[in-house]
Design a protein with these regions (language model features):
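Charged, low-complexity, helix-prone segments enriched in Lys/Glu/Asp/Gln
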Residues: 78-81, 85-86, 215-230, 325, ...
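Intrinsic structural disorder
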Residues: 1-3, 12-22, 101, 133, ...
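Generic detection of intrinsically disordered/low-complexity segments and helix-coil linkers/edges
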Residues: 5, 33-35, 221, 254, ...
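N-terminal regions immediately upstream of nucleotidyltransferase
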Residues: 1-132, 138-155, 169-173, 178-182, ...
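Catalytic cores of NTP-dependent nucleotidyl/adenyl transfer enzymes across multiple folds
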Residues: 86, 93, 146-306
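Pol beta-like nucleotidyltransferase catalytic core
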Residues: 259, 263-400
């Protein structure tokens, strides 16, 4: 009997389910056009065999561990934030259990999401207005009107002030935002991401209700949080997420990376390789910059697919939400940082200060350093994100 050809190469056949790439079936590639994967030598063991086992980099690993200690909040700050979040959550759950005590809106459930839940929170950069924050998704049974959200904020502020000492009441403030509510208490903040049940989305009016796209985004945050809890459990993943978040807040070119994209990129870099073992933080960090530099999120690239999209019908490539200028800025910024990492790793990771390498030619650790330049500008992208067909046409023009 003729043996059937294995679908995957031998090194991928026994891969655990959580390490599978989130890619649609190969037939989907033909339907989408000439999209392609970026160069990644770790997934090409036949052409680029490893000369040695991937162990921790003796130079980069101590620098990464030192930076992680600087980015991690102190035990006192973490306890204070957890105490503040617990108080807010208790007040919200009280409204869930006794809906008749508050008639402006009815709460269905409250869920923890974000960096504080996943233990990947970092200290805000010096001089920024940011605070240590925790996120809670509040799902309403009723429609999220602006008036109801404001009344919910006033009720929470009143209930919290009843438990505070007189000197603590002045620190508590609450304000309405485009995503819901923000409760601030000195150097800490709790963001309430308001949304409603999916059955109510089609009835939302942007003039009186919270924006429909924002409601969907806040609701999807609960799915993302569950996925991260179940899949991103390796310590290297949490370390890489912290490092990427730190790079994003220090370098303007990495701002297009949102938290969900950072989690997917970190998971891909740590787990998706030619073995069943996870990469150490030093190699995973360099691999993240290498993939971004190779054009992982440029037009025509397969990029990273959303695990919650329908892969059989309409697989969603996450980088298509960016404008072409943002995609180009993300690529050339990563290329510049990757070259700087080889010259002065302590500067890239934030351990030591140095010149602004994106301002122009400079001396970096005794080496003349010239940054990469953009090839797409704002007037060319018009500030609009490109869909898959538009990005495919741009890909064809570049390669023609």
């Amino acid at each position: 009997m003729r043996r059937s050809r294995p679908r995957f190469s031998p090194w991928r056949q026994n891969r655990p389910p959580y390490q599978q790439s989130y890619r649609p079936h190969s037939s989907q590639y033909q339907q989408q056009g000439q999209s392609s994967d970026v160069f990644d030598f770790l997934n090409l063991p036949e052409s680029f065999p490893s000369m040695k086992q991937l162990i921790d980099d003796p130079i980069l690993t101590p620098i990464i561990m030192e930076r992680i200690q600087q980015l991690t909040p102190s035990a006192a700050d973490s306890f204070a934030l957890m105490n503040f979040v617990t108080r807010v959550r208790q007040k919200l759950e009280a409204l869930v259990l006794s809906p008749h005590s508050f008639t402006a809106c009815q709460i269905s459930e409250v869920r923890d999401v974000g960096s504080h839940k996943h233990n990947t929170i970092i200290i805000p950069s010096i001089g920024s207005q940011s605070r240590l924050t925790s996120d809670l998704v509040v799902v309403l049974k009723t429609l999220p009107t602006r008036e109801a959200i404001e009344q919910l904020g006033n009720r929470l502020k009143q209930d919290l002030q009843n438990e505070y000492q007189p000197n603590e009441e002045a620190l508590l403030s609450i304000q309405s935002t485009d995503y819901g509510l923000s409760l601030e208490n000195g150097t800490m903040a709790v963001h309430l991401l308001l949304t409603t049940l999916p059955a109510n989305w089609h009835t939302l009016d942007p003039t009186i209700h919270l924006d429909r796209a924002m409601c969907k985004r806040n609701f999807n945050a609960t799915k993302h949080a569950k996925w991260v809890d179940e899949v991103c459990i390796h310590p290297s993943n949490k370390v890489l997420v912290r490092l990427l978040k730190d790079l994003r807040q220090r370098f303007h070119g990495l701002e297009p990376l949102n938290p969900w994209l950072i989690n997917l990129l970190a998971h891909h870099c740590v787990t998706n390789n030619n073995s069943t073992e996870q990469l150490p933080p030093s190699y995973a960090f360099k691999r993240a910059l290498q993939l971004l530099s190779s054009g992982l999120f440029l037009p025509g690239s397969n990029g990273l697919y959303d695990p919650f999209s329908d892969a059989n019908m309409h697989p969603s490539r996450l980088h298509t939400i960016m404008t072409s200028e943002e995609q180009d800025r993300l690529c050339y910024t990563s290329q510049t940082l990757l070259r700087a990492l080889a010259i002065h790793p302590k500067y890239v990771l934030g351990i030591e200060n140095g010149p602004d390498i994106f301002a122009g030619p400079c001396q970096l650790n005794g080496v003349l350093f010239v940054p990469n330049e953009p090839v797409v500008f704002d007037n060319e992208s018009n500030g609009h994100a490109l869909n898959d067909s538009q990005q495919q046409s741009m890909f064809v023009e570049v390669n023609s």
